[in-house]
Design a protein with these regions (language model features):
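Active-site neighborhood of HAD-like aspartate-dependent phosphohydrolases
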Residues: 1-53
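Metal-dependent phosphoesterase signature
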Residues: 40-76
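Short, acidic loop-to-helix structural element flanking the phosphoryl-transfer center
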Residues: 62-89, 94-102
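Substrate-recognition "cap/lid" segment bordering the active-site pocket of phosphatases
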Residues: 94-145, 149
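Short acidic-hydrophobic, aromatic-tinged amphipathic segments that line or gate anion-handling sites
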Residues: 115-119, 169-177
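Short amphipathic alpha-helix with an adjacent loop that forms part of the alpha/beta core around
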Residues: 125-129, 178-190
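Acidic, Mg2+-coordinating phosphoryl-transfer loop and its flanking beta/alpha structural elements
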Residues: 135-173
Length: 192
Protein backbone atom coordinates (compact mmCIF):
# COMPACT_ATOMS: atom_id res chain seq x y z
CA UNK A 1 0.00 0.00 0.00
CA UNK A 2 1.30 3.45 -0.89
CA UNK A 3 1.93 5.88 1.97
CA UNK A 4 1.11 9.42 0.86
CA UNK A 5 -1.10 11.10 -1.72
CA UNK A 6 1.18 13.73 -3.23
CA UNK A 7 -0.29 16.37 -5.54
CA UNK A 8 2.20 18.17 -7.77
CA UNK A 9 1.86 21.25 -9.92
CA UNK A 10 3.79 21.23 -13.22
CA UNK A 11 4.78 24.67 -14.52
CA UNK A 12 7.47 26.24 -12.37
CA UNK A 13 7.31 23.31 -9.96
CA UNK A 14 8.80 20.40 -11.87
CA UNK A 15 9.86 22.66 -14.75
CA UNK A 16 12.19 25.65 -14.96
CA UNK A 17 10.05 28.55 -13.70
CA UNK A 18 11.69 31.02 -16.10
CA UNK A 19 11.77 28.95 -19.31
CA UNK A 20 9.13 31.17 -20.95
CA UNK A 21 11.28 34.27 -20.43
CA UNK A 22 13.44 33.95 -23.56
CA UNK A 23 10.28 33.58 -25.68
CA UNK A 24 8.73 36.65 -24.06
CA UNK A 25 11.90 38.74 -24.34
CA UNK A 26 12.15 37.93 -28.07
CA UNK A 27 8.46 38.52 -28.74
CA UNK A 28 8.18 41.79 -26.80
CA UNK A 29 11.71 42.96 -27.61
CA UNK A 30 12.49 43.23 -23.90
CA UNK A 31 15.43 42.26 -21.73
CA UNK A 32 13.84 41.02 -18.49
CA UNK A 33 16.12 38.87 -16.33
CA UNK A 34 15.07 36.01 -14.02
CA UNK A 35 15.78 38.27 -11.02
CA UNK A 36 13.16 40.72 -12.31
CA UNK A 37 10.43 38.06 -12.33
CA UNK A 38 9.07 39.00 -8.90
CA UNK A 39 5.37 38.52 -9.68
CA UNK A 40 3.41 35.46 -10.78
CA UNK A 41 1.50 37.80 -13.13
CA UNK A 42 3.62 37.74 -16.28
CA UNK A 43 1.91 40.79 -17.82
CA UNK A 44 2.95 42.76 -14.74
CA UNK A 45 6.54 41.50 -14.99
CA UNK A 46 6.73 42.50 -18.66
CA UNK A 47 4.83 45.76 -18.05
CA UNK A 48 2.35 44.97 -20.81
CA UNK A 49 -1.43 44.73 -21.13
CA UNK A 50 -3.03 41.41 -20.17
CA UNK A 51 -4.46 41.05 -23.70
CA UNK A 52 -0.96 41.41 -25.19
CA UNK A 53 0.29 38.67 -22.90
CA UNK A 54 -2.66 36.41 -23.80
CA UNK A 55 -1.94 36.93 -27.51
CA UNK A 56 1.71 35.95 -26.92
CA UNK A 57 0.69 32.91 -24.86
CA UNK A 58 -1.79 31.67 -27.47
CA UNK A 59 0.94 31.87 -30.09
CA UNK A 60 3.65 30.06 -28.09
CA UNK A 61 1.90 27.92 -25.45
CA UNK A 62 2.35 24.59 -27.25
CA UNK A 63 6.01 25.25 -28.02
CA UNK A 64 6.78 26.47 -24.49
CA UNK A 65 5.00 23.58 -22.77
CA UNK A 66 6.58 21.03 -25.11
CA UNK A 67 10.16 22.28 -24.79
CA UNK A 68 10.43 23.57 -21.22
CA UNK A 69 13.25 22.11 -19.15
CA UNK A 70 12.85 20.06 -16.00
CA UNK A 71 14.26 21.38 -12.74
CA UNK A 72 17.40 19.57 -11.52
CA UNK A 73 16.85 16.20 -9.79
CA UNK A 74 13.09 16.11 -10.50
CA UNK A 75 13.11 12.85 -12.46
CA UNK A 76 15.22 10.88 -9.96
CA UNK A 77 13.27 12.12 -6.95
CA UNK A 78 9.88 11.46 -8.53
CA UNK A 79 11.07 7.96 -9.49
CA UNK A 80 11.86 7.31 -5.82
CA UNK A 81 8.68 8.93 -4.48
CA UNK A 82 6.54 6.92 -6.91
CA UNK A 83 7.72 3.63 -5.39
CA UNK A 84 5.99 4.37 -2.08
CA UNK A 85 3.46 7.15 -2.77
CA UNK A 86 0.64 8.13 -5.12
CA UNK A 87 1.73 10.94 -7.44
CA UNK A 88 -1.01 13.13 -8.90
CA UNK A 89 -0.19 16.00 -11.24
CA UNK A 90 -2.72 18.78 -10.66
CA UNK A 91 -2.26 21.71 -13.02
CA UNK A 92 -4.18 24.88 -13.82
CA UNK A 93 -3.34 24.41 -17.50
CA UNK A 94 -6.25 24.72 -19.91
CA UNK A 95 -7.81 21.62 -21.49
CA UNK A 96 -6.25 22.40 -24.90
CA UNK A 97 -2.89 21.45 -23.33
CA UNK A 98 -4.00 18.00 -22.17
CA UNK A 99 -2.19 16.01 -24.88
CA UNK A 100 0.94 18.19 -24.71
CA UNK A 101 1.04 17.71 -20.93
CA UNK A 102 0.60 13.95 -21.13
CA UNK A 103 3.26 13.60 -23.85
CA UNK A 104 5.67 15.87 -21.97
CA UNK A 105 5.52 13.66 -18.88
CA UNK A 106 5.82 10.47 -20.97
CA UNK A 107 8.72 11.80 -23.06
CA UNK A 108 10.59 12.76 -19.89
CA UNK A 109 9.68 9.42 -18.29
CA UNK A 110 8.08 11.14 -15.31
CA UNK A 111 6.09 8.64 -13.23
CA UNK A 112 2.55 9.45 -12.12
CA UNK A 113 -0.73 7.86 -11.15
CA UNK A 114 -3.04 10.47 -12.70
CA UNK A 115 -2.93 13.88 -14.39
CA UNK A 116 -5.64 16.47 -13.74
CA UNK A 117 -5.84 19.44 -16.14
CA UNK A 118 -8.13 21.80 -14.26
CA UNK A 119 -8.26 24.91 -16.42
CA UNK A 120 -8.47 26.91 -13.17
CA UNK A 121 -6.14 27.91 -10.35
CA UNK A 122 -8.63 26.66 -7.75
CA UNK A 123 -6.97 23.38 -6.80
CA UNK A 124 -8.64 22.90 -3.40
CA UNK A 125 -11.58 20.76 -4.63
CA UNK A 126 -9.24 18.36 -6.47
CA UNK A 127 -6.89 18.18 -3.47
CA UNK A 128 -9.92 17.24 -1.34
CA UNK A 129 -11.05 14.61 -3.87
CA UNK A 130 -7.57 13.06 -3.86
CA UNK A 131 -7.26 13.17 -0.05
CA UNK A 132 -4.00 15.04 -0.60
CA UNK A 133 -1.34 14.69 2.11
CA UNK A 134 1.18 17.06 0.51
CA UNK A 135 0.80 19.55 -2.34
CA UNK A 136 3.96 20.73 -4.14
CA UNK A 137 3.41 24.13 -5.72
CA UNK A 138 5.23 27.25 -6.99
CA UNK A 139 2.31 29.70 -6.93
CA UNK A 140 2.15 31.66 -3.69
CA UNK A 141 -1.60 32.33 -4.05
CA UNK A 142 -2.32 28.64 -4.67
CA UNK A 143 -0.13 27.68 -1.70
CA UNK A 144 -2.00 30.07 0.61
CA UNK A 145 -5.41 28.88 -0.64
CA UNK A 146 -4.46 25.20 -0.21
CA UNK A 147 -2.85 25.73 3.19
CA UNK A 148 -5.83 27.75 4.46
CA UNK A 149 -7.98 24.76 3.50
CA UNK A 150 -5.88 22.50 5.73
CA UNK A 151 -3.42 21.04 3.23
CA UNK A 152 0.31 20.81 3.90
CA UNK A 153 2.10 22.61 1.05
CA UNK A 154 5.71 22.51 -0.06
CA UNK A 155 6.36 25.80 -1.88
CA UNK A 156 9.33 25.49 -4.21
CA UNK A 157 11.29 28.72 -4.09
CA UNK A 158 11.12 31.19 -6.98
CA UNK A 159 11.71 34.93 -7.28
CA UNK A 160 7.93 35.45 -7.52
CA UNK A 161 6.82 33.63 -4.36
CA UNK A 162 9.06 35.08 -1.64
CA UNK A 163 6.29 36.29 0.63
CA UNK A 164 5.39 35.37 4.24
CA UNK A 165 4.31 31.76 4.79
CA UNK A 166 1.81 30.29 7.21
CA UNK A 167 2.20 27.20 9.41
CA UNK A 168 1.02 24.76 6.70
CA UNK A 169 3.57 25.88 4.10
CA UNK A 170 7.20 24.75 4.00
CA UNK A 171 9.59 26.47 1.60
CA UNK A 172 12.01 24.25 -0.33
CA UNK A 173 14.79 25.59 -2.52
CA UNK A 174 15.18 22.51 -4.73
CA UNK A 175 13.93 18.99 -5.28
CA UNK A 176 16.53 17.46 -2.95
CA UNK A 177 14.99 19.51 -0.11
CA UNK A 178 11.51 18.46 -1.23
CA UNK A 179 12.57 14.82 -0.98
CA UNK A 180 13.89 15.34 2.56
CA UNK A 181 10.71 17.14 3.67
CA UNK A 182 8.50 14.36 2.27
CA UNK A 183 10.62 11.73 4.01
CA UNK A 184 10.18 13.57 7.33
CA UNK A 185 6.42 13.92 6.81
CA UNK A 186 6.15 10.24 5.88
CA UNK A 187 8.03 9.20 9.05
CA UNK A 188 5.80 11.47 11.17
CA UNK A 189 2.67 9.98 9.57
CA UNK A 190 3.86 6.42 10.28
CA UNK A 191 4.56 7.33 13.92
CA UNK A 192 1.01 8.56 14.47
Amino acid sequence: MKKLNICIDIDGTITDPYYWLSYANNYFNSNISENQVTSYDISKVLNIKQNDYLEFYEKFKFEIHTNQKLRPDVKDILDELYKFNNLYFVTAREKSLELVTFLYLLNHEIPFDEIYILGTHNKVPKAKDLICDIFIEDSYDNAIELSNSGFKVILIDTNYNRLPLNHNIIRAHNWMEISQIITEISIEKEAI
